[in-house]
Amino acid sequence: MSATDRTRELRSLLFRLRKRVKPLAPGHAGAPPEGTDPVVHELVYSFLVWEASAPLATAALGRMRTAVVDYNELRVCYPLELASLMGEGYPLAVERATRLRAALTEVYRREHGTMLGRLIDLPKRDARAYLEALEGVPPFVAARVVLLALGGHAVPLDAMLHGMLAAEEAVEPDGTIIDAMGWLERTLRAKESEEAYLLLEAWRKRKAPKVGPTAGAGPKRSSKVQGRSRGSETEP
């Protein structure tokens, strides 16, 4: 299929989605907890959406926020503990937890705290490169933070969204996710990218499987996670 035909299929799909689903709100991650860096908040939520869905991510984030005091505490959780907080049957829970913990740890090392607010003032290309270079961060997560937290031009894709688009012949089925993201960002104007992504997430919301509501989260902890002091400023 030619690039022109592929573009036609993409725009036809987006046109149909506008009639079938309501796009998610740009702020569907919810407001960050008081005192929390909003970019870090979007980073954590983006990890939960990756290869899952927005409803699953929202539920998991609620459980995590009940169980820990702040996002810095997530950094010192063990991966299995983090995975249990996400909820029973959460997709790729252990891998997701391992990646999230690695990313938060590297943010802490680079910034001397769990904060990414300085990315707001960086050129968007530099901010995206920073996020993509963090250990454990999938391209989807970096692109989503750039799009929704930093106001940059990006069309986040993971394997699930890529497969959905490929089934509609809206992206090259044999290409990589990186290639598809690049093509989408060249094909859609900057002002179109946010709506397109939010439509795709609303579409995924209808298709994604649900997981059980239970999790291994206990009452909110006040001082320690698995024997580590929450207030410590040293590396785990």
Question: Where are each of the predicted segments found?
Answer:
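Short amphipathic alpha-helical surface patches that serve as generic macromolecular interface elements
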Residues: D158-L165, I177-E185, S193-L200
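Short helix-capping and hinge/turn segments at secondary-structure transitions, especially at repeat
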Residues: K22, T66-V69, T105-G113, E132, ...
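Catalytic DNA-binding helix-loop module of base-excision-repair DNA glycosylases/AP lyases
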Residues: L43, L48, L100, P123-E169
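A general structural motif at alpha-helix termini
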Residues: L61, R75-Y78, M86, P123, ...
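N-terminal polyanion-binding entry modules of DNA glycosylases/AP lyases
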Residues: M1-D121, R189-P236
